[in-house]
């Protein structure tokens, strides 16, 4: 198995070509899938890797620290199950704020749109992105 895809001195195109040439069809298809960690078997569902993890169930965590710990555990499992150590992308809804305990909650988009205040919307998006990034 070639490790050229990990060689940072190569172009992204060369690295991608090397990685895709080594991946099986099942591994490629797994990169297109999303896993809801509260449903199903994480070990089984990520045996070929996984492209995305939904964080919708993170709202059950009692704190940002707990949610972050859950995310680290899931990422470790995903990367250990992938022959190539490919990390998952964690997907979080942020329309009205980060869906985790203690995050700021904002009005729905239609209410914010009715304010006709683009600067307010920009500020809200900055807050939501900062809170989601804090999760990891």
Predicted regions and their residues:
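N-terminal beta-rich core of secreted/periplasmic extracellular enzymes
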Residues: 1-136
